[in-house]
Structures are given as C-alpha cells and as structure tokens.
Amino acid sequence: MRALTMILAALLGCTVLTGCVRENPTVVALLASDATQRLEPRVDAEAFEARVEATCEECTVRVYDAEGDAAAQAAQADEALDDSADVIVLDPVEVEEAEALVGGGEDEVPVVAHTTLVPGADWFVGTAEPVVPDDSGPEAGSDLEAARQVVTGKRRSMLHVPATAMSEQAADVAVAVLAGAEVEGAEDLEGVPSFLHAVTEVRLADLTTVLVGQGAVTLEELCSGSTARRCERIGFV
C-alpha cells in the first residue's frame, strides 16, 4: 500500500513527506448497486473508502448508491462523470444496462467492474464463479444470520462472499490505475484483466477463523441472545 501512495504522490508532483494541495482532487467514484442491503452483500463501501484514503492522500471518494435501480445507476454514472471522476468502480445493477456505461464518451474514464463482470470494463474484481442466491429463506441472507443458524444447527453450512476483501482490492486497482502503475496478479476473464476471489463454504468449525477472522461478523454478534449458550457449549466464548 505504501508503494501505491508513493507512486501516486510522484505522479502528482509532490512528496510523501511534504505533501501537496491540489485545486481539483483526484476523484474515485464507487457506483454501488445497493450499498445498504445486508441480505447478499456485494460491496463494502466503508472498507473501499478507507482503503483509498489509506493509499491515496490526494483522492476523494464519492459513493453513489443506486438502491437496486438500473435507471438510477445510469443517472449516477452521468453525475460522476460530470463531477470529474478520474476512475469509476462499478457494481452493476444490471449487466446489460451497465455495458452502456463502459467506454462511453470522448474522454474515456477507466472502469473497474466489481462483483459482476461487465463486458468492456478495464478491470474486474469478483468471484471465480457466480454466487447462487441462498434459498434458506430471507432471514438467512446475511452473513450474520446465516452464521447464527450454523451455530444453532439450523443449517449445516453457509456460503461466504468476501465482500470486504473484494472491495479493498477494487480500491487498490483504482489507485494503481490512477498512478499509472502496473497492476500485477490479474488473470484473463473474457478479455478483461480480473482478480477472482473464492466463495467459501463455512461450517461450524470455520466460523471464528473465517467470518470473525476476516471481520465479516464479530464474536459478540455471533454469540449474543439466542446463540449465547450454544457458543459457550462449543467453546466459542
């Protein structure tokens, strides 16, 4: 991360030690399909913003939340461009609609597709395989509720999508692109340089190492209320 900061600082004509002030800050736009929903988290907007701020002092992050509306996302893309976005990280509501947002306009802005591959995007950060929606009911949609059901034995396992890790990597790619730095480790997926994360099947023995360890849930959230006694019996607390 320090390397990215130093590269970008040099690009902007200032040093990490002395700093610099730009009249027009570098703008990183995050277009989320639905940043507030918890049932199937795709983007960790807070982690994304924190990562950009940690690696690029001169960057400003602007988060646009389409709330599941493709038309709203198209309007937000126009707004981001009007606000002089230097790079766009796009979590598409609908792929077909999102294709129109990629490569449009005379001054093409780099696009990093997040979660779902968008043909024509410059980069992609997502999962190796499409995530099949959980069919255990709406109460089992979030990582927390699904994990609590694994604790109680209502379900044997759950699928964990590493939204935080994906969002942090999307931030790293965006900052590197701005700096003109080489982004290593990508693989080709349908002609798009991609970083693919694994969707993990999590069982009871893996809850603390995977979910708690990665910060997806806290031990207090996992072992409170109706799951408290069960957590004590299995040695979680």
Where are the model-predicted features located?
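Extracytoplasmic "Venus flytrap"
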Residues: 27-55, 62-71, 93-94
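Hinge/cleft segment of the Venus flytrap/periplasmic-binding protein
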Residues: 169-237
